[in-house]
Amino acid sequence: MKYLMLIAGDEAAWEAQTDAERTASYARVVAWWRAQTDAGRIVSGHELQPSSTATTVRLDRDGRATVVDGPFVEAKEMLGGYAVLDVPDLDAAIALASSWPEPDTLEVRPIVTDG
Amino acid sequence: MADAPRPADEVLADTLREERGRLTAALVRILGDWDLAEELVQDAAVAALEHWPSEGVPRNPGAWLMTAARRRAIDRLRRHARYRERIRLLTAEVTQMDPGVATGGPMDADDRLRLLFTCCHPALNREAQVALTLKTIGGLETAAIGRAFLVPETTIAQRLVRAKRKIRDAAIPYRVPDLAELPARLAEVLTVLYLIFNEGYLASSGETAERRDLARDAEWLASLVARLMPDEPEVLGLLALMRLHLARAEARFANGDLVLLPDQDRRRWDHAAIRDAVALLRRAERMGRVGTYQLQAAILAEHATADSWAETRWDRIVALYDLLRRVEPTPVVRLNRALAVAELDGPTAALAELEPLAERLGGWHLYHAARADLLRRVGRAEEAVAADGRALELTDNPAERRLLQQRLAAGGVSPGAAPRGRRNGPRAG
């Protein structure tokens, strides 16, 4: 079963950390990511640049695009990364998300496969 | 049961209640298709209604239903070649398991438990958990659930459809959680059962007789879980808690009016049921793993075994609340503890404990009603009337509203003028 795991966190809190804290937290995430990838539970995924780099493109019914600076929604917790999971069921996906080493919020959603 | 033959539809209703969850669980396990499983159970019930009135109710109605459902499943699946493996499973189980089916072997006990944990999965919202549990484990029809919650049947049907879709599309598994997850997942199940119980127990007002008694349904579900998980003390604690409430249900109303605990006629309590529930609670306590339901039941047991309100062991009750407060540090627990303190140390001490809770409980009618009672007892009549008035604004429950209106009519002058005194007449109970 494939799931998309979206990882959202408080960017301001991240910014407020010291360099040493950030390095330590990166080390935790990298170790975690490697372990999950080696176990075959993470198929792919990436960290994203901060939401200040996001651009939203909105299309109307006539196909006209409006381009706006910023992410879909302005919120305290912003999307910071994602992973595609391959695990047996939702419990396994929840267990994986629950072991994420940082104080973030994660959304797990099944991916539509075949038609 | 053997003397007067009962009408077939009555036996069918009773049997379905007991067997529906079992049938559905076994079929979901084999077929992996929730809707098909429910449809087959429904078909089997219809077949029973056709056969039983003329041919007589079979000796083992549960096994009869299971066999009927399985045969229909095989007929349905034969049309699709890809179900060959499932047909093999169904055929094997029909021949192997039928004699023992309705006696509840360990295998089908597991089925129901698995299904219950799926129904109460934390990835489903609370309303969906409640509807799924009542429908699939409790054997209630969608319409009956709607009536119980005063919600249109179509709303319940929608919730069930959405929940089942999520179970399928998000691949919510069908299993009993492993040991590491079990405490949290079991707590979720117990929360759902207690919520169903409270919906029935608190909402009942003695005048809506057509409304289904969800409290009894919840008690039945809890007793099922207690049978399936006999070594979980919190399950037994919750069951004891429900039974202690139900043992006093008769005395909660007099002529349609709500009667509070201090004023209840204790002769109307079911003392045999109270003894059994206390014994159950003691068994849970001996397992040595305390929890919120055991503590709440222990508090209720103190009330239920006291000869009168005045003779209640308030020291023990306050001590139990101190333990409960550690397990569950909520303002509601602190409010209830304060009310016990009122009996042990007097209303002034209790009022002092109540004041800091105003911010968090100010929107709850029972906070104001409790405060009004204490204010009346210390002679602050005007403030008492104001607090009762606030409580009245905050509740829609007709029985509670009547009680508050009576208090307000009495002017809040003295405890004797409150409904408590009026209800104590010899014929009131």
Name each model-derived stretch:
Chain A
Residues M1-G115:
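Conserved, structured core segments of small domains
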